[in-house]
Amino acid sequence: FFPNKLTERQILIYHCIFSRSYDGYIRQKHIEALLDANTPEWAMPYIVKICDEYVYAILETVYQKLQGENCEKYKMLCQLNFDYFKLGHCRMISYWNEYYRYDYYRYKEYIGKKLYGECFGYNKTGQKSIQF
């Protein structure tokens, strides 16, 4: 009912807002919509932010959509906001340790680690890899 009344940009804003819902299923649905919509740069922080949360299915969805894609814009975003990005990485590890450590005993096999490393450019030392 609403898409007829909203512009393409308004629909993307709608998906960004609902990607922060209290309900994980709603967050996942709207993140999928953002990823399917050829995400504009201004919406990328919503995708990066949701990847530091505890819902494994969302991490899996984002990784599946971004894996094999050109993620240079995501990597640049993360490097330009490195302190915030590093905090999100630490939060993701904390959730792995609390909720998923027994299912994914080896951290390097956990999808969050793969997502942060392959798609967002987090390197082993946690240092900025882009020189300005």
State what each model feature region is.
Residues 8-16, 40-49, 75-79:
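Amphipathic alpha-helical scaffolding segments comprising HEAT/armadillo-like alpha-solenoid repeats
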Residues 1-5, 17, 28-38, 61-72, ...:
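Structural detector for internal amphipathic alpha-helices that build alpha-solenoid repeat scaffolds
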Residues 19-22, 52-57:
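Short coil turns that connect the paired helices of HEAT/ARM alpha-solenoid repeats
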Residues 11-30, 77-92:
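Membrane-interacting alpha-helical segments
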Residues 70-132:
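Long, helix-rich interaction regions
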Residues 56-62, 75-76:
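Boundary/linker segments of alpha-helical solenoid repeat arrays
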